Amino acid sequence: MEAQNIRIRLKAFDHRVLDQATGEIADTARRTGALIRGPIPLPTRIEKFCVNRGPHIDKKSREQFEVRTYKRLLDIVQPNAATVDALMKLDLAAGVNVEIKLA
C-alpha cells in the first residue's frame, strides 16, 4: 500500500459542514502517520433557477434561486493499513458526499 495514494473528494451544500468533515479526515490520517496534501478547495458549482412568481400571468415577475455545491480535495500520500482502517471507521456528518479513489 505504500506505493499508492488515496485521493478523497468531498462535496456538500454547506461549506461549514464540509470544512469540519475535511478536518476530521485530515486529523485521522495524521494520527496514523500518513502525509497529507490539502485540503484543496475546488471551484464552487452554482446552479441558478428562475421561476415565475404567479401561477398565471406576469411573466416579468420572477424569482431566482441558486444551489451552491462546494468541493474539497484531499490527497493522502503515504497511507498504511492503520490509515485505511481508521478512515473506514470514521463517521462523518450527514450531507457530505465522499468519493475515494486509489491513485
From Swiss-Prot:
Alphabetical UniProt keywords: Ribonucleoprotein, Ribosomal protein
Coiled coil listed as a keyword: no
Segment forming the signal sequence: none
GO CC annotations, alphabetized: ribonucleoprotein complex; ribosome
SMART domains in the cross-refs: Ribosomal_S10 (SM01403)
GO MF annotations in UniProt: structural constituent of ribosome; tRNA binding
Entry's Gene Ontology BP terms: translation
Family: Belongs to the universal ribosomal protein uS10 family.
NCBIfam families: PRK00596.1 (NF001861), rpsJ_bact (TIGR01049)
Protein role: Involved in the binding of tRNA to the ribosomes.
Subunit structure: Part of the 30S ribosomal subunit.
Protein known as: Small ribosomal subunit protein uS10
Species per Swiss-Prot/TrEMBL record: Novosphingobium aromaticivorans (strain ATCC 700278 / DSM 12444 / CCUG 56034 / CIP 105152 / NBRC 16084 / F199)
Gene this chain is encoded by: rpsJ
